Amino acid sequence: TEGLILLNHGVFSFGNTARLAYSRMINLVDTAEQYLVNHNAWDVERSLNKVPTKSMHIAVAQLRKGISLVVGSPVLLNITNSERGIDFSNRSDVAEIATRGPVTPDHVIRTKRIPMIGRDVEKFEQEYISYFKTNEPNAKERKTMLDAAPRVILDKEFGLCAVGKNMSEIGIISDLYEHTIECIHRAEKMGGWQVL
C-alpha cells in the first residue's frame, strides 16, 4: 500500500522511510492535481470585482464594534482585499455553499464552523447559540460554549474579512479561509462541495 485517500478529507502516504513516504505523497498529489486539470477543476475563474475603498471606514468600525461586544473584549477586523475573497463573497450561491461547514474539522478552532454572510452580527450570534444548544447535549462530554462571534465574514462589499485578537491570529484565519475558498471552488466544479 502506497497511500490512502479519505473521501472529502485528505491524502496519506506510506513508506519504509520518510523519504519514500514523501516521494509517494508527491506522486499522489501530482496525480490528483492532473486529474483536476483534466476535468477543468484546477483553474478557478474570477471576476474583476472592486476592492473595498476608504469610504467604508465607518461601516467597518461599526461591524468591529458589534463583534467586539459579542466577544466581550476588543477585537481586530481585517479586510483581506484579496481578489479571491471578493469574488467568492459575490457568488450568488455564497450563503448556501459557504455555510456547509469547514474543509476539515480542526479549522473550527480558528474559523468557527461557518462564516458570517453579510454584516448581521446579532443574527449570527443567535444562530450560533441555537446551534450550540441543539448539539451540545449530543456530545459525549459536556462542552462550554465560546463566544458567539464570527471569525470569518463574507460580505459583498468588503469581501473576505477575518476577526481576531491580533494580526497573527487574523493571518492564520485568513490563510485558512483563502484555502477553503479554493477547495469549495474546485469541489463545486467536480460535482459539489461536501463536508465530512
Residue ranges and their predicted role:
Residues 5-11, 109, 158:
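Histidine-centered catalytic micro-motifs
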Residues 10-12, 17-20:
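Short acidic/polar capping segments at secondary-structure boundaries
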